[in-house]
Amino acid sequence: MLKIADTTFTSRLFTGTGKFSSPELMLEALRASGSQLITMAMKRVDLQSGNDAILAPLRQLGVRLLPNTSGAKTAEEAIFAARLAREALNTHWVKLEIHPDVRYLLPDPIETLKAAEVLVKEGFVVLPYCGADPVLCKRLEEVGCAAVMPLGSPIGSNLGLRTRDFLQIIIEQSKVPVVVDAGIGAPSHALEALELGADAVLVNTAIAVAHSPVQMAHAFRLAVESGERARLAGLGASPFNPSQPDTLQLRATATSPLTGFLSQLEEQEHV
């Protein structure tokens, strides 16, 4: 079981709603995925009616909807979008996305942290999409985010876990769930993330653009289940498996440590 804020999930596969060829195919694929948390871009929703081609099928699934702020380029725009989503969809959950760079869609760390602080204070359950930066993820955790969502590789690239080393550090030090988001292009990537110790993955493009989105969604479902079972069963030597010896070096070692130098300076000051 995975708990985020006040909600428990039995599925560790979260999914998106973009790029499907039809709402009907989207609904069928999401059913096959077994996902219980589905994200949707507010810019694609008809806020006037609150009931459109995206919302109608999603509500049939009985899942938790996670509106995202995709398209926002600043903290102010993201906060505005989150407030709109809360009113239109009656949810205080939000996936925080701020990416001003339209070419690579990389998240803006400064604006993301600023928006997260405001939204958490307003009572939102904030799940921020961010770079695989261990320092930033810790800061997002400290301001009250319910989970962190570091990228595996750029959105829609299907390149897999190109940030693996940094994801390891994030997972090791995080006290909130870690959801690997973006770049997961094959079921094997999702399995790898779960074996690594991630709490969940979010997949959209790889399912939506597959020759058979329904079969691919089911494949991802099985991969995530397998990855979680493998981790719980106890992989070989790994820093995430306390029953086995830790043979991996994950800590940095300074080539020019300042310890002795600073001690000498302190001694000189006291002379």
UniProtKB/Swiss-Prot annotation:
Gene3D superfamilies: Aldolase class I. Keywords: Cytoplasm, Schiff base, Thiamine biosynthesis, Transferase. The active site is at K95. GO terms for molecular function: thiazole synthase activity. Pfam families: ThiG. It is found in: Cytoplasm. It is an enzyme of class 2 (transferase). InterPro entries: Aldolase_TIM, Thiazole_synthase_ThiG, ThiG. 1-deoxy-D-xylulose 5-phosphate binds at G156, A182, G183, N204, T205. Homotetramer. Forms heterodimers with either ThiH or ThiS. Catalyzes the rearrangement of 1-deoxy-D-xylulose 5-phosphate (DXP) to produce the thiazole phosphate moiety of thiamine. Sulfur is provided by the thiocarboxylate moiety of the carrier protein ThiS. In vitro, sulfur can be provided by H(2)S. Belongs to the ThiG family. This is Thiazole synthase. It comes from Yersinia pseudotuberculosis serotype O:3 (strain YPIII).
